């Protein structure tokens, strides 16, 4: 299983199995705080979506992925993740913005669908299963 380590404000966060299937986001303690599933073949695209860790903190996670079948791309450009600054969680339900777009090719874009997420409810962070809907071009989490 491949692992890619990134940092957020100096804190390491690991992303496992990012070549396809389930993507596990882990904190520095090795605890999985978000799981995402890639459906179909990942194209050369960029994703930007919101994740919440087990402490109820929210982050934007940006992903640039490219399948190995694309020839001529540097190896380091394949499956590159980075995390930007934490944002204020002002909504009870967590949104995933559909802000991915084609960078190099005109292929059909395949989004990453969440399998689990963490949601704060009355000060308690709960693990919720996959129940999402699209509203105004954004993913919305349903209630836990």
Regions found by a protein language model. Give the residues of each.
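Intrinsically disordered, low-complexity segments enriched in small/polar residues
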Residues: 1-144
